[in-house]
Each structure stands twice: as C-alpha cells, then as structure tokens.
Regions:
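A short Gly-Trp-Pro
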Residues: 5-162
Length: 162
C-alpha cells in the first residue's frame, strides 16, 4: 500500500504495511523512548520515509553495521519527558545525534524544535511504526564484516539527500 502527501517543501511517497493499524495519528500517537525510560517522545503523523544508514557515524554510534531510521515532520514529533536527560553529539558534518545521558540509547537525529524533519531510531519505538525501510544509504561505507542484504531496497553510495 502506498500513500503520497506533502510536508513543507517536499512531496513524499511512502510504502506502508497493508492493513496496518499502527500508523501514528493525532488520535493514536506512536510513542517511544530510551532503555531506562527517562526520555519519552511521541509521533502524531505517518513517517515520511524510512531506511538503513550504513555511514561510519551510525556504525560507531550504535555499535552495529547500520541504523534503521524513520523520518517524521518536525511538527509531528513531541518530546514528552526527559529533555534534561538528552545529550547531543554534533559531528563535524551532519546533524546532531541525540541520546539518553543515563542509558546511552540512541534516539533521534536533528533538532526537534527547529529542523524540518527528525530522524527517529526505529528501535526506540514502542510498537510497529507501520512503515518498512525503503532504501539503504552510505552503502560505500558499509561494514565489511556485515554483508549487505540482497533485499531489493534502493541503494545510495552516499547520502540519499533527504
């Protein structure tokens, strides 16, 4: 099942899980948070896109071969609790990577109060987000010890250019 919609300056075509009742809406927000529970957030609109990032920042930040992320419009993302627990790592290039200071959980990238979009770590969500990854980016930087899945997803050597 596919849906198309516009957010601020860009049109999106999103693949959602057929028959999914888990898409976030204002009446049924999708919540998530860190491992220790200090930081909680909610999303009130469907994801704009989702994908795997194989960049070296994501590898080092997560300790894994890639990071599964879903992009949401800033206006649909709300921090519910734990702002004082959030810490940010600002790489030389790119957007801030936010995590919980207590448990270290990687939660999202971007500045939720000012950026057009927020990239949420799909593993930080409480339930199925109703979207599946559609692409793999930074495949030129993929970890040599984890072969890329032959899953038919679009591949980008560098950034997808959100």
């Amino acid at each position: 099942l596919a849906a198309s919609y516009r957010s601020s300056r860009r049109d999106y075509r999103v693949v959602i899980v057929s028959g999914s009742d888990s898409l976030p809406t204002p009446d049924a927000p999708l919540q998530g948070g860190c491992l220790c529970g200090a930081v909680r957030f909610e999303i009130t609109a469907p994801f704009l896109s989702a994908g795997y990032c194989h960049c070296t920042h994501c590898q080092r930040r997560t300790g894994t071969g890639s990071s599964a992320n879903g992009r949401v419009a800033q206006e649909s993302f709300q921090l519910l609790q734990g702002q004082e627990q959030l810490r940010a790592f600002q790489p030389e290039t790119g957007v801030p990577k936010l995590f919980c200071a207590t448990c270290g959980s990687a939660l999202f990238s971007g500045q939720p109060l000012s950026d057009e979009q927020v990239a949420v770590r799909l593993g930080a969500l409480d339930r199925d987000p109703g979207i599946r990854p559609q692409y793999r980016q930074f495949v030129d930087s993929a970890a040599p010890w984890e072969p890329l899945a032959q899953d038919g997803l679009e591949r980008y050597p560098r950034s997808r250019g959100h």
